[in-house]
Amino acid sequence: MSNSFPRLGKPAPLFEGDVVRFDSRKKEIFFDTISLNKIIEEKKWTVLFFYPRDFSSLCPTEIHSFNRRIKDFEKANCVLIGCSTDSKNSHKAWMEKPRTKGGIDKLSYPLMADPSLRIARSYGVLQRELGQALRGTFVINDEGILMSLAVNPSKIGRSVDETVR
């Protein structure tokens, strides 16, 4: 694991990455990019949460908990982003697969791919030996300042309600 977390009250590490999104109007899943700089320019807050990997057993529970609360994040002028070290193609395949068959189905927020491990490393959540991230949640204000962080081991879930609060 990387041993240095970003510091509270300081600028969050900038990121830019490929994401997979679902367009509910067109009913299609597509690739896009996202960056913290662009979100800051739009004067929005960001919740960036890391999860260990696609197609795992605990991750869908949290991912769907975040999805059920998407309106709360939007009401708070906040962009929600899920991130793992999987590829964008893995994210897409997972999103295309129904929940009943081990997928996550369509989400109302993007999943960011970090196969280079760069983003997970910059946020201090990379488990180098596994090539995956811990369960980290980072709240970044509309000026790019890190306001909150919480990191859990891979096998321990997080409280989405606490993140919304």
Question: How should these model regions be labeled?
Answer:
Residues M1-R165:
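Chalcogenol-based redox active-site neighborhoods
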